[in-house]
Amino acid sequence: MESQYGTQPPSIAALFVRQARSAPERTAVRGEDAELTYRELDRRSDHLARRLQDRGVRPGDVVGLEADRRAATVVALLGILKAGAAYLALERRYPAERRRLILADSGATVVLTRDDLDAMAEGSAPDPVETAPDDVAYVAYTSGSTGAPKGVRVPHRAVLRLVVDADFLTLGPDDVVLQYAPVAFDASTLEIWGPLLNGARLDVAPERDLAIGELTEHIHHFGITVLWLTAGLFQQVVEYGLDDLKGVRVLLAGGDVLSPPHVNQALAALPGLTLVNGYGPTENTTFTCCHTITAPVEGAVPIGRPIRGTGVHILDADLRPVPDGEIGELYATGDGLALDYLGNPEQTSRAFLPDPFDERPGARMYRTGDLVSRRADGVLDYHGRADRQVKIRGFRIEPGEIEAALAGRDDVAEAAVVAQPGPDGGKRLVAFVTGHGGARPATLALRRELGEVLPSYAVPSHIRVVDALPLTANGKVDRAALTADTSPARPELNAEHRTPAPGIEAAVAQLWSDHLGIDGIGADDDFFELGGHSLVGVRITTDLEREYGVQISPVTFYLAPTPAGLADAVVQAGGAR
């Protein structure tokens, strides 16, 4: 593939500086903590780069960052790049053990905390640094099948290929792009650098979880014109109502399979909207293919064509091209490819292969593990995974990592993790475990201990103890049987079962049953012990808002995570008992 950016500056920071000099007084970023012009963002990131250099950070180093949704975080990202280093975003919600593993694996020389960022607001200009297109811009950790997360090293070239002269999205000075994805999630690469490298404005959403009504109100109030939503969040926004999105020019959605009925509803409600299905793994920098949806869809939504700067091969098991219409595995090529898995040459060599169809020295292709077919017009259709990897709420998960964590427990003999269909149309993780000698591991303790080493999205919604795992005829675990083995039974919980009181308490419990797919929920049952998570919490609070005319923040689930507690919150907010 030919590089698309030609005479453009070779790095993210250099291209940003060009934008800052061309329109210094234009607003660059707005967040709850600050609103900065391009000149101010340039100056503050210079100061932070200088402070990092004074602390011994050198070109090529990795700098860890507690990445909240704040304007100060954007200053830090740019400052790290100006120092010639690569950023490693750390979500504050990550368990301490996972953060420790990631930091140790990355070799980060410095870790910036929220307090550090506030203290580095002033300073002097940094020493100039020459950054090449193939220097590392950031390290993103993904789930690993062996039980350890993998660090993906993404170069500046790959980010520029995504946001400079893109053919799936045009950004300009009149655009306002929302950053809602966590910085550690690769969708933020588009959300942050898309506007800042094209002279647009970046709007950083509040740090807290937002109810759907709060999110759409924010989109309307701050004049968002471009936004990215995961497939699950897109579905919720469509179900809530699209009136607040009438000012949105482009809506990109993906991270999982899009629901055709919701796509069609959005197109009908927002006739001026450009709706794009975006597909791509972290190893190919956010997007590999995009499909602009221009008409109502029947059947599955395609993933489209490769974006500019990207090529694809559809190959069989012997790396031979398959004919149009036949299913093969997707391999990606071009400027978007990551450099490697940090410190993991074995996994790198398995995933990043020499491209046999490109004669240029060093040409590579990335094995995505996704099965696709190509239509006669070049559009690609998605047909699932070739391996066991799954996506839950937009996050890529290797069930093997969870199984390894479970197998490390003394009381677990065997473990298998599968993705089952959830009651809301998405997927949820369910773990099946056996105990030694007929003993029954405590599932509540297992979920709690998994939460200490895995991110919340990788903790199974349910853990079921079985006498034995089912096997196929050749003696392998029958994962298809486990996927089909759904049960609405109430899991083991700390609380004794108490029947909900008639009225709001019973209505809340029923709402939980509907959204969690569990029968017999008690008044004192804990939402998170039942397998609830923030996205389900947002759905429930949205339903309560409609039913009782009150606004309940999703944060309430952390403060009062039971039907009884949530019912009291509804009453206190003005809902009738």
Task: Identify the residue ranges that each predicted region occupies.
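AMP-dependent adenylate-forming
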Residues: 1-2, 9-13, 50, 111-129, ...
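AMP-binding/adenylate-forming domain of the ANL superfamily
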Residues: 1-110, 114-139, 154-156, 161, ...
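Amphipathic alpha-helical regulatory segments at dimerization interfaces
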Residues: 18, 105, 265, 269, ...
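Phosphopantetheine carrier-protein modules
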Residues: 23-27, 31-35, 53-62, 383-388, ...
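Phosphopantetheine-attachment site and its flanking helix in carrier
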Residues: 46, 70-81, 397-401, 506, ...
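Motif- and composition-driven signal specific to adenylation
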Residues: 72-78, 85-103, 126-324, 329-338, ...
